[in-house]
């Protein structure tokens, strides 16, 4: 109750602004009426009519919407009394430009735009330090939640063997496009339209692009390693995480101690496995001595067969519904909920079809290319094109 207690004692108002008002922000807006001492000052969006419509559909009161300043230009609002900007466009190039402007205006920023964070996060976090402002991952997105679990483990003296997320993945999904995404995602086009789900964005979840991007963000925030040959997406249920997400030398599936991996909720036959982690996150920790191993057993903790490794997981992430955690952490505690510290991982573009000279790549979730997680060293030495470009 630490932050909640500070919130009760806080006598100010936390003024925020959104850059982009899509699904993630709409989820936050649906919680807004229950949140204390946060005021939406501004919403910047190219389509103001749609942004206002999303506010209405999310349940914002008419009088609340009338008090929000709407603009289609970030430049016009940088001088307003705003404590925290939330960049949620999903466009890596535009998002990077937005972040630079916000930071140089001495404003704190939360990057829902993990695509921009993976492309330029180290530069942006360094720029934030130079300007004495906070640059933060968005709580509710899986990278921030994974980093939180990693921090818990390290603070308590555990070695983190593996960390990652669940997803619905199959090798043939790598060639999914916005045209057939809903069949692969598991909902009807009508359901997707009603929920205002962007087919290109949600296709990035199916193809593995988003998982590669999010695991790169975790690597760059935590110092964990990339897998040797990209994410492999083994189908692993939660009670087998401690058995399978340990090094191959110890009977597991991963390359080495201290890496990331994403796991699939379906097997190679596309059957959903029992006790899957499609929407969640996990870490595997390693006991450093026999006494700790004994404690794992005595207190009923899930372990591998040797008893040396244990796993904890969170079955869901609540996406924009829990973004307020980042806002309060910055406003009340002057702390991020995770940020990029390194440039150790990159997500490169891999062709999904035969490309012709001059063809424009359409980025994550598109028709032309898909993303693969590799080390930044290999990316730079190979002169590979980042997916975000």
Which sequence ranges carry the predicted segments?
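Rossmann-fold NAD(P)-binding glycine/threonine-rich loop
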Residues: 94-101, 105, 113-133, 138-141, ...
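N-terminal Rossmann-like dinucleotide-binding module
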Residues: 1-58
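Rossmann-fold NAD(P) dinucleotide-binding segment
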Residues: 76-88, 92-111
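C-terminal catalytic/substrate-binding lobe primarily of soluble NAD(P)-dependent oxidoreductases
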Residues: 1-7, 184, 188-389
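Short, ordered loop/turn segments at secondary-structure junctions
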Residues: 46-48, 90, 114-117, 140-141, ...
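Rossmann-like NAD(P)H-binding beta-loop-alpha module
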Residues: 136-206
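Conserved N-terminal Rossmann-fold NAD(P) cofactor-binding segment
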Residues: 47-80
């Amino acid at each position: 109750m630490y932050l909640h207690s500070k919130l009760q004692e806080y006598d100010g108002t936390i003024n925020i602004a959104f850059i982009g008002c899509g699904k993630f922000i709409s989820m936050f807006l649906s919680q807004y009426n229950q949140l204390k001492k946060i005021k939406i000052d501004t919403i910047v969006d190219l389509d103001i009519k749609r942004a206002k419509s999303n506010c209405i559909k999310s349940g914002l009161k008419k009088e609340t919407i009338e008090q929000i300043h709407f603009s289609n230009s970030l430049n016009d609002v940088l001088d307003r009394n705003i404590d925290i900007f939330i960049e949620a466009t999903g466009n890596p190039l535009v998002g990077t430009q937005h972040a630079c402007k916000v930071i140089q205006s001495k404003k704190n920023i939360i990057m829902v735009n993990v695509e921009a964070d993976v492309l330029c996060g180290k530069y942006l976090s360094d720029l934030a330090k130079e300007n004495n402002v906070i640059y933060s991952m968005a709580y509710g997105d899986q990278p921030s939640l994974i980093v939180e679990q990693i921090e818990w483990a390290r603070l308590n003296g555990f070695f983190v063997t593996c960390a990652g997320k669940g997803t619905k993945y199959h090798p043939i999904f790598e060639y999914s496009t916005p045209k057939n995404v809903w069949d692969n995602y598991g909902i009807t086009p009508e359901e997707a339209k009603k929920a205002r789900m962007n087919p290109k964005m949600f296709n990035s979840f199916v193809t593995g692009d988003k998982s590669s991007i999010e695991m790169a963000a975790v690597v760059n925030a935590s110092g964990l390693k990339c897998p040797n040959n990209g994410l492999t997406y083994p189908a692993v249920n939660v009670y087998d995480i401690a058995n399978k997400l340990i090094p191959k030398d110890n009977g597991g599936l991963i390359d080495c101690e201290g890496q990331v991996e994403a796991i699939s909720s379906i097997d190679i036959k596309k059957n959903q496995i029992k006790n899957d982690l499609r929407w969640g996150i996990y870490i595997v920790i390693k006991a450093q001595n026999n006494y700790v191993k004994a404690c794992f057993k005595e207190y009923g903790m899930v372990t591998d067969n040797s008893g040396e490794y244990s796993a904890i997981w969170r079955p869901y992430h609540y996406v924009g519904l829990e973004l307020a955690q980042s806002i309060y952490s910055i406003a009340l505690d002057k702390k991020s909920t995770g940020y990029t510290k390194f440039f150790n991982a990159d997500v490169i573009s891999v062709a999904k079809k035969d490309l012709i000279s001059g063809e424009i790549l359409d980025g994550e979730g598109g028709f032309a290319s898909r993303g693969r997680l590799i080390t930044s060293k290999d990316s730079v030495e190979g002169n590979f094109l980042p997916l975000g470009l």
